[in-house]
């Protein structure tokens, strides 16, 4: 029985995709114990992964060094006597906790002069490990099986039926089939399909007999209101009114989910919802929704993907030229 300490990623979608690594470890050793270090927001997601024993909160913000905090956490974990540590992020600071915890075997990709902190450093061959999920999963495999990993398991989050019932009552949701819209893009506006287009999609969905839920965080509230404006009782703006764990349960009920390339898109994929992923500045070849039940919407313009937070050409044609009719036609006819 091996005992693993995983240093998880900092983004919602990446943490969902990391479940493929956790499942891989369990497939290779069903008695394996897996604990995951992550940001505070990640605990509810990790609690829905049956492979994970404990989520360990790292009380530092994204981008903060927090060396003393990492040292203190590492020292507190020494009594766990972990056999292996897998450090998913490539930053120097990400490898500190396993080092201070005196984990015997510490593996991660080469980067930021981590020679002492890691005692197995893997080369990141981007031509072979050409997807995020491949990179994560490869770290849980022997070197000879890692380039690339084969038969990668798909994320599958647990759903809480009691919480689903509570959410329906709390938000007075309809019994109509639901389409979830996720219009936020935490990374930047270059990943965001226009809000006016989401409004047109919502209008058509309601006319076709659906209810529409707009999901997102507090920052998305105003956009959510714009999407449901004048659409009546079957359009509900839930942005900022639910927790991340609630989004898991709501998306599991929704018949379809239409989303920018975002963390919520990956959650929808991990609960089996039919996913319509909108791409432009990013690529579905690198971070696809990990499900067979998906449709990708991407114009594949010459300037795309740029992987920039804002459009360097100042037109965002990869989003603006993907018209509502193009999406509506596919979403409502499948």
Residue ranges and their predicted role:
Residues 1-334:
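Catalytic machinery of carbohydrate-active enzymes
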């Amino acid at each position: 029985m091996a005992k693993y300490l995983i240093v998880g990623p900092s983004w919602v979608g990446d943490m969902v995709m990391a479940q493929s690594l956790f499942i891989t470890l369990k497939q290779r050793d069903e008695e394996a114990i897996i604990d995951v270090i992550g940001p505070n927001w990640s605990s509810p997601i990790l609690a829905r992964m049956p492979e994970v024993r404990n989520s360990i909160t790292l009380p530092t913000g994204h981008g903060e060094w927090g060396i003393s905090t990492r040292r203190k956490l590492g020292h507190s974990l020494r009594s766990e006597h972990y056999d292996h540590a897998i450090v998913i992020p490539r930053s120097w600071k990400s490898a500190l906790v396993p080092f201070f915890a005196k984990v015997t075997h510490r593996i991660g990709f080469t980067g930021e002069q981590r020679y002492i902190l890691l005692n197995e450093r893997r080369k990141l061959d981007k031509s072979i490990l050409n997807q995020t999920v491949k990179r994560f999963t490869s770290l849980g495999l022997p070197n000879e099986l890692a380039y690339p990993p084969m038969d990668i398991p798909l994320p599958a989050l647990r759903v809480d039926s009691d919480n689903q019932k509570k959410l329906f009552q709390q938000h007075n949701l309809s019994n109509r089939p639901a389409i979830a819209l996720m219009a936020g893009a935490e990374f930047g506006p270059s990943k965001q399909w226009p809000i006016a287009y989401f409004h047109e999609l919502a209008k058509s969905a309601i006319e076709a007999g659906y209810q529409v839920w707009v999901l997102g965080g507090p920052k998305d509230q105003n956009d959510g209101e714009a999407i449901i404006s004048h659409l009546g009782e079957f359009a509900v703006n839930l942005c900022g009114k639910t927790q991340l764990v609630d989004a898991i349960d709501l998306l599991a009920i929704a018949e379809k989910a239409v989303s920018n390339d975002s963390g919520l898109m990956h959650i929808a994929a991990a609960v089996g919802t039919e996913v319509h992923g909108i791409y432009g500045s990013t690529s579905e070849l690198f971070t696809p929704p990990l499900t067979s039940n998906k449709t990708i919407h991407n114009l594949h313009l010459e300037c795309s993907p740029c992987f920039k937070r804002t459009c360097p050409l100042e037109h965002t044609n990869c989003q603006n030229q993907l018209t509502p009719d193009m999406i509506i036609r596919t979403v409502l006819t499948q």
